A protein has these predicted regions:
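Non-transmembrane "mature" sequence context
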Residues: 2-183
Length: 183
């Protein structure tokens, strides 16, 4: 009987604690709604494309983090991971960043890129993330990226990644592919 009384008191105490917490800080009924889980996966996969925890110490949980990261700069070492995800050499990567290969090569691995280069790298990483998502795998995406596409005048999508407008054009083509429209 004492054990049952103890359990009842414990249950009442739990309810009292929950009520006190809910008055001050209302807790949502669902701890992790699907939209938040999807966003977390999106930003974590972006971090993986950029080299994971080895190159990005801070976590990415939203657009504000991307803005702050752009302003702060990212390490040169993120370029290797991104180049690998795109299936390109560092020489090609430097061309996409409108910088000479030698200038990129001179930087230390931990040296931060300037704001414009960082923004371009993040844009390319988001593009790679979207491409892998639509095409289905990293390897298939790399093959697609280097293959001539009719909608691009029989040029590979890689040829258009040196400008923001080109990236947006290729993202539109990915959207068409996702919808099943031949491009």
């Amino acid at each position: 009987i004492q054990y049952v009384v103890y359990l009842i008191k414990l249950e009442k105490l739990k309810k009292a604690v929950v009520i006190k917490k809910s008055k001050a800080y209302p807790k949502p009924e669902v701890d992790n709604p699907p939209a938040l889980q999807e966003a977390a996966v999106k930003y974590e996969s972006l971090r993986v494309i950029l080299g994971g925890r080895q190159t990005l110490r801070q976590s990415l949980s939203g657009d504000f983090d991307l803005i702050a990261l752009t302003r702060e700069g990212i390490k040169k070492s993120t370029l290797k991971s991104l180049a690998e995800h795109l299936g390109i050499s560092m020489e090609t990567m430097s061309g996409l960043l409108h910088s000479s290969y030698r200038n990129i090569q001179r930087k230390d691995e931990d040296e931060l890129l300037d704001t414009l280069k960082t923004e371009k790298v993040l844009e390319l990483a988001a593009f790679a993330q979207r491409g892998i998502e639509v095409i289905g795998s990293k390897e298939a995406f790399k093959e697609w990226l280097h293959s001539p596409i009719v909608a691009l005048g029989n040029k590979p999508p890689l040829d258009f990644l040196d400008t923001s407008f080109g990236i947006q054009l290729v993202i539109k083509i990915l959207g068409r592919l996702e919808q099943g429209v031949f491009s």
